[in-house]
Amino acid sequence: MRKAGNFQGEYLQDYWAIAECGFKTNGYFVEFGAANGKEISNTYILENQYSWNGILSEPARSFKDELLKNRKCSIDHRAVWDVSGKELKFMENKDAFLSSLYSKENTNTLGEKESYLVETITLTDLLKTHSAPKIIDFCSIDVEGFEYKILKKFFSDGIYSINHIAVEHNWRADGNLLIDLFLENGYTQKYMHLSQRDYWFSRISIST
């Protein structure tokens, strides 16, 4: 697999996604955190070159104006978490691409710039709110350490299916938990030699 065209994904995530989907047009994506929606975005090309629609979630205030300018799909400024309707502390880093909900584990490594409260929403509720189809073609997840609890809740809800998922692990200690969670829910891991700090998974039922 090689990079081509104007793909933005830092580690070929967008190219992998569109290739797995047979370079289809009019697919559906969800991406959180979406940052400014363009720079190293895993869904920008899907929307702008392949006419996909979808949802972006990004609570960082510094990205709000850019995100609205860069993208035409649905945008939600709540933080995806495992519970909806909570207000949690959000840490906006000097490098805004590293901003995240607060946790004891990331407060030292992220380097807090400022903090403020953000409302949370589960992935299932995010999809419901924006009238997403029951089968999502591609999901990109980068939430600096909260991936496992978000996905565990999503899989337990059992309402929506996602065919392909790119989830950043950044070599965190809970990586094996994430892998096991995907395997238990009918996914197979793809291109481990290419995915770098991401895990890429496809649903077995659509990859065989």
PLM features: residue spans?
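Phosphate/nucleotide-binding beta-alpha loop and adjacent structural elements of enzyme active sites
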Residues: 1-208
